[in-house]
A protein has these predicted regions:
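Charge-dense, intrinsically disordered terminal/linker segments
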Residues: 67-84, 88-98, 181, 189, ...
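Catalytic centers of nucleases
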Residues: 17-99
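Generic structural hydrophobic/aromatic packing signal, biased to beta-strands
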Residues: 49, 103-105, 233
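Glycine-rich short-loop/terminal segments
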Residues: 1-44, 58-62, 184-210, 214, ...
């Protein structure tokens, strides 16, 4: 339980730090009305991704660079540019400006890109089907960029842990609250599992320590036989002292 408590505390610290950084962005209005959610996405991605790893007992994987350089994040030491645009095609086209690094898109947009590249017959975004023309344009942009990079699309396109709507200014508080609640829920579940396992192991150990019925009966029988033999030996010896041997016993002696 100590390990679980430590993992929980570490995860929540990551969320708190990210939330503070996001609130600073919101209060300062960084990025303006149209760009603020991009900065929110960077810090939220870092905090939530690291919090989830911390709860699993793993080291941090993501760092927010926050230095106005070309890369927004370092993920496992690799530079990553984060793009959260409302328009999927415009979002993809920015990849040409960052060919020295991976690109990260919102989770729901990556689901669309993945479905397109897997050749799904129907592709949806926010419950609405994309037209065949939209699907074709998305596929074309990804294939052209992949050819220039010399990589398959899944080697340079990464998915955020967050959807586009989750990093909007009016939604980010709820996003962090839900993530915090999720960590607490998992903590409660794992605590119950640990407690149940401890009780099960304790019961199994107790049961193993007890002799089974067959062993108990066998032990009782052996004990009775030994006691009976001992009593008979004493009886014969007493008769011998009285001058009577066993072959001289009468029915009354028996």
């Amino acid at each position: 339980l100590k390990d679980l408590a430590a993992r929980r505390a570490n995860a929540l610290r990551n969320l708190d730090l990210a939330n503070q950084n996001v609130m600073n962005i919101v209060n300062s209005g960084r990025g303006g009305e149209n760009g603020i959610h991009g900065f929110i996405a960077e810090f939220a991605q870092t905090g939530i991704a690291n919090a989830r790893r911390a709860f699993e007992g793993l080291e941090k994987s993501t760092i927010t660079l926050n230095n106005n350089g070309p890369a927004d994040l370092l993920i496992n030491g690799k530079p990553v540019q984060v793009k959260f645009y409302a328009n999927l095609m415009n979002e993809l086209k920015t990849s040409a400006e960052y060919r020295s690094m991976d690109m990260m898109f919102s989770k729901d947009h990556m689901d669309v890109f993945r479905a397109v590249m897997h050749g799904d017959k129907e592709v949806f975004l926010n419950g609405q089907p994309l037209t065949s023309n939209q699907v074709q344009k998305i596929k074309q942009i990804i294939e052209e960029e992949s050819n220039i990079r010399g990589l398959s699309w899944d080697k340079w396109m990464q998915s955020s842990v967050l959807k586009y709507d989750q990093v909007q200014r009016e939604a980010i508080d709820r996003t962090f609250t839900e993530e915090t609640d999720n960590i607490k829920r998992q903590t409660s579940e794992q605590k119950s599992e640990i407690s149940n396992k401890a009780n099960t192991d304790k019961a199994a150990a107790y049961h193993k320590a007890q002799p089974n019925l067959g062993e108990a009966n066998k032990a009782a029988g052996v004990g009775a036989a030994i006691q009976g033999g001992l009593n008979f030996g004493i009886f014969v010896y007493q008769k011998h002292e009285e001058g009577k041997e066993i072959w001289q016993f009468t029915a009354e002696d028996w």
